[in-house]
From Swiss-Prot:
PROSITE patterns: PPR (PS51375). The gene is PCMP-E57. Residues 434-509 are annotated as: Type E motif. Pfam families: E_motif (PF20431), PPR (PF01535), PPR_2 (PF13041). This is Pentatricopeptide repeat-containing protein At1g33350.
Length: 538
């Protein structure tokens, strides 16, 4: 009887270097063709039976496939823990997986690094340190980064540029370590655009916008991420006009090509300043660069047009979006609510529930929009219903913003007993916004006694804001109690309180002009007032 020979007969041939190489190639190919975890387990079993479970090369392949394709970190760790003498590449494979799943696996990454240090063989190198330094900003201990810093200094790897940059990024990611980050930055033997951007982002994160801008201006070269970092810094710190100005500079740089992050940052600034014409130009720019289809850009456009009052354009962008995220739905609901179109806001929510009930669930922002819509529309019953829906059906714990909306809704409707009852059930203390909305409601309905209680609490929360006492003085005047009105006015003077000045913006030729009440610092004040007087005289 003849012997049956298969295409895999060489797998059971006598051991040789060539046979082992062929076997390694075969198993490597099988790993790359695997589709799920059971396949991988079969391959691992075959490696054990074939005496190849000690192969660093194949174990590395298993780990990479398990983490990158299957995203199964627990089984990857299972594979690693059964390897007798792991090398640096295997440690790096697991650390890469942990550092790619931050902040979820930050503590696992740091513990794994400490395991490697305690074993002493192999020692961490310039590949390992940057990986563990990614995790340290997410740890609760403020000493994690300095601990790694001390260890890498002793090992001599602190001189590697890639390690220095990772260390800088780790320090700069923590507000408490920003001084150490700057010290390290100044001592770096070689600074590249990545290290400059890391330091810039650190200043932005700590709110030190002046140092962030100064550093940006000193940069010898700038790339798109560094431009995006300074744009985000300005936007996040309320310098919206400066962000718009920087964007204009950016698009005039011949070697710089703005991306989706750029557009999102500048659209956010435009939304806050109300620069609709400039925003339309940015929308056209994004369309020409094929960026408008990006889900984050699309969401930003909906938010922008909604805040600027162009709800038709916001609806158009929303409807054209190929994939509508929860952020887009929330933006649309909040846009309609902001402009008093309550029924349309509610209709968007009902559509979201009907089309996406299994894919997208509303969050706390959704219900803030709905409650605001009910407030502007005076829909008390619906507002109460949505508040109950949020807690009972979707299990969302009410935040102070939700309570504020509901109390505002009840107060505007003159249902003060119900508003006070809601306040008594809150797990947190009422803030300035809640007492302020209650004071406004008292002014509408002439509820003097409760207004006095509201002002007392508002003054305790913010003694420097004289606007609340001024409102109370006006309410006393409207009620004919001039003595109390005079007393309230004197209180403002004695407490050195101030009333925040009103302001407005106007956009002319893509340039924003901002005016404050009684402010005459504008260089063209005389001409502006002359035109204003001529308009009033008509």
């Amino acid at each position: 009887m003849g012997t049956r020979v298969t295409q895999f007969s060489y797998l059971h041939a006598p051991s040789s270097h060539m046979a082992e190489q062929l076997l390694n190639q075969f198993i490597s190919a099988v790993i790359s063709k695997s589709r799920h975890l059971n396949h991988l387990k079969q391959v691992q079993s075959f490696m054990i039976v074939s005496g190849l479970s000690h192969s660093h090369f194949l174990c590395f392949k298993l780990l990479r496939f398990c983490t990158l394709r299957l995203c199964n970190l627990s089984y990857a760790r299972f594979i690693f823990d059964r390897f007798s003498f792991p090398n640096t590449h295997l440690y790096a494979a697991v650390l890469t997986a942990y550092s790619s799943s931050l902040p979820l696996h930050a503590s696992s990454a740091f513990s794994f690094f400490r395991l490697m240090v305690n074993r002493s063989v192999p020692r961490p190198n310039h590949f390992i340190y940057p990986l563990v330094l990614k995790s340290t900003p997410y740890l609760s201990s403020a000493f994690s980064t300095p601990l790694v810093h001390t260890h890498l200094f002793k090992s001599g790897f602190h001189l590697y540029v890639v390690v220095q940059t990772a260390l800088l990024h780790s320090y700069a990611s923590s507000v408490s370590h920003i001084t150490l980050a700057r010290q390290l930055f100044d001592e770096m033997s070689e600074r590249n655009v990545v290290s400059w951007t890391a330091m810039l982002s650190g200043y932005a994160r700590s709110g030190d916008i002046s140092n962030a801008v100064a550093l940006f201006e000193d940069m010898p070269e700038r790339d798109v991420p560094s431009w995006n970092a300074i744009l985000a810094a300005c936007t996040q710190n309320g310098l919206f006009l400066e962000a718009v100005s920087l964007f204009r500079r950016m698009i005039n740089e011949p070697s710089i090509r703005p991306n989706e992050v750029t557009v999102v940052c500048v659209l956010s600034a435009c939304a806050q300043t109300g620069t609709l014409q400039l925003a339309k130009g940015i929308h056209a720019f994004a369309y020409r660069r094929d960026l408008s289809s990006d889900v984050f850009v699309s969401n930003s456009l909906v938010d922008l047009y909604g805040k600027c009052g162009n709800l038709e354009e916001a609806s158009s962008v929303f409807k054209m979006a190929s994939k509508k995220s929860l952020t887009a739905w929330n933006s649309m609901i909040n846009c309609f609510a902001l402009h008093g179109r309550s029924e349309e806001a509610i209709a968007v929510f009902e559509e979201m529930m009907k089309l996406n009930i299994n894919d997208i669930k509303p969050d706390h922002i959704t219900f803030i929009g709905l409650l605001n819509a009910c407030t502007h529309g005076g829909l008390v019953s619906k507002g109460r219903g949505y508040f109950d829906l949020m807690t009972n059906r979707f299990g969302i714990e009410p935040r102070i913003e939700h309570y504020g909306c509901l109390i505002d809704l009840l107060g505007r409707a003159g249902r003060f007993d119900e508003a006070l009852e809601v306040m008594s059930t809150m797990k947190m203390k009422a803030d300035e916004a809640i007492w302020g909305s209650l004071l406004n409601a008292c002014k509408i309905h002439g509820h003097l006694d409760l207004a006095e209680v509201a002002v007392k609490n508002l003054v305790a929360l913010n003694p420097n804001n004289g606007g609340y006492v001024a409102m109370m003085a006006n309410l006393y005047g409207e009620m004919g109690n001039w003595e109390e009105a005079r007393r309230a006015r004197k209180m403002i003077k004695h407490q050195n309180a101030y009333k925040p000045p009103g302001w407005s913006r106007i956009e002319i030729d893509n340039e924003v002009h901002q005016f404050y009440s009684l402010d005459k610092s504008h260089p063209e004040t005389e001409e502006i007032y002359m035109i204003l007087d001529s308009l009033i005289s008509f």
